[in-house]
């Protein structure tokens, strides 16, 4: 297991595996409003996937793992998109700050993230160990 990190694994496979791990573990609580909320003003509908909250949490955990520290505002920019304005030119809209904040708070509650001294969140030692362990299991599956 030495030397295996999240960078060594395909992003989509890792996010799917980590989302399944988060759902299976049962530690992470989901808000009641996740089935009706839009993920940003640029969206017309709520997500179709019933497990989208776990997928977003896995993607945010991977995003913060690959960087030193990330704030909620930066995550809103990352998960934003262009708004459809008909015939007029499209413009970028940020993603929902509430969704990003609740996901980060959920990850912080289970010990994956911790607050940084300079603002924002960073990955904790326990979180890094969990993410590396899942990356190692994915590499083992690929080698078989």
From Swiss-Prot:
Recorded GO MF terms: RNA binding; structural constituent of ribosome
Segment forming the signal sequence: none
Pfam families for this protein: Ribosomal_S19e (PF01090)
Location of the protein in the cell: Cytoplasm; Nucleus; Nucleus, Nucleolus
Keywords per UniProt: Cytoplasm, Nucleus, Ribonucleoprotein, Ribosomal protein
InterPro entries documented for this protein: Ribosomal_eS19 (IPR001266), Ribosomal_eS19_CS (IPR018277), WH-like_DNA-bd_sf (IPR036388), WH_DNA-bd_sf (IPR036390)
Region described as Disordered: 83-102
Chief place where the protein resides: cytoplasm
Domain of life according to the entry: Eukaryota
GO terms classed as biological process: cytoplasmic translation; ribosomal small subunit assembly
This protein's GO CC annotations: cytosol; cytosolic small ribosomal subunit; nucleolus; nucleus
Keyword 4Fe-4S: no
Keyword Cytoplasm: yes
Family as reported in the entry's similarity comment: Belongs to the eukaryotic ribosomal protein eS19 family.
Function recorded in the entry: Component of the ribosome, a large ribonucleoprotein complex responsible for the synthesis of proteins in the cell. The small ribosomal subunit (SSU) binds messenger RNAs (mRNAs) and translates the encoded message by selecting cognate aminoacyl-transfer RNA (tRNA) molecules. The large subunit (LSU) contains the ribosomal catalytic site termed the peptidyl transferase center (PTC), which catalyzes the formation of peptide bonds, thereby polymerizing the amino acids delivered by tRNAs into a polypeptide chain.
Note: There are 2 genes for eS19 in S.pombe.
Protein name: Small ribosomal subunit protein eS19A
């Amino acid at each position: 297991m030495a030397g295996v990190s999240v960078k060594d694994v395909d992003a989509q496979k890792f996010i799917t595996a980590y989302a399944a791990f988060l759902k299976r573990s049962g530690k992470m609580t989901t808000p009641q409003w996740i089935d009706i909320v839009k993920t940003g003003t640029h969206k017309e509908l709520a997500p179709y996937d019933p497990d989208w909250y776990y997928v977003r949490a896995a993607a945010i955990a991977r995003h913060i793992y690959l960087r030193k520290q990330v704030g909620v505002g930066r995550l809103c920019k990352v998960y934003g998109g262009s708004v459809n304005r008909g015939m007029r030119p499209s413009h970028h809209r940020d993603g929902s700050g509430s969704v990003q904040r609740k996901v980060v708070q959920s990850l912080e509650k289970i010990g994956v993230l911790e607050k940084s001294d300079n603002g924002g969140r960073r990955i904790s030692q326990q979180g890094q160990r969990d993410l590396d362990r899942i990356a190692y299991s994915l590499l083992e599956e690929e080698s078989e």
